């Protein structure tokens, strides 16, 4: 092989490596400090990367909504304990049926403690976001009726980083029961909790249940708030989008609108996914 061919081959490999990197930027981030990762997983510095559809990086989304009010992080704000008071929380939980296994499990104290354990919620929070969180938590637990998935599958993958504990199952527990598999229970590493060794801790402790769900929300959902309720629904459980589970999507949107009305705010316009 000539030197010219070697140089050409290295050039092609560099391009391929850059392409592969950019296509996975939602997992690996972009190589350049000035680059943005788009919601489709590509890196760049132009408006299609850093504008309205920016996922991470130095996003510039102000004025990029193209006339639509999509931002779930917009509108009236307040501290979590003033937006959701003890009386309002009790009113929501009073609708839980007496035959529900989680009746009385989800408490106001656990709710507030879990929220305030994340820096983003120690100050004022958009009421829309709180409404969206409640809608997803309510839907994910069947209106706060359950604290664990009815179908108790094992959901164990061969992960060296988050190995399964012998005899333990990693099915959905808590408020977002679409969160399954041992990798997600690896959240215990970030929460300071032994969730891989003791996944049932999520269904034993209301505070842990809220923290587990809030960890997922902060990590996977919150970066997309400006894209609308439909987009964050896709990030919680993409199976609900499209034509496969339209009734599920409609019911979740209905709950979001109801919680928005309860908090005195208008929902965003990006409801569908």
Curated annotation (Swiss-Prot):
Q: Which GO terms describe its molecular function?
A: chitin binding; chitinase activity
**Which SUPFAM superfamilies does the protein's record reference?**
Lysozyme-like (SSF53955), Plant lectins/antimicrobial peptides (SSF57016)
Domain named Chitin-binding type-1 is located at 23-61
The keyword Disulfide bond appears for this protein? yes
The glycosylation sites annotated in the UniProt record are: 99
- Region annotation Catalytic: where it falls in the sequence: 78-273
Q: What GO biological process terms are annotated to this protein in UniProt?
A: carbohydrate metabolic process; cell wall macromolecule catabolic process; chitin catabolic process; defense response
Q: Which organism is it from?
A: Arabidopsis thaliana
Protein name stated in the entry = Inactive endochitinase At2g43600
Q: Does the keyword Amino-acid biosynthesis apply?
A: no
Which keywords annotate this record? Chitin-binding, Disulfide bond, Glycoprotein, Plant defense, Signal
Residues annotated as signal peptide: 1-22
Q: Which family does it belong to?
A: Belongs to the glycosyl hydrolase 19 family. Chitinase class I subfamily.
| Pfam families assigned to the protein according to its UniProt record, in alphabetical order | Glyco_hydro_19
Q: List the disulfide bonds.
A: 25-37, 30-43, 36-50, 54-59
Q: Which domain of life is it from?
A: Eukaryota
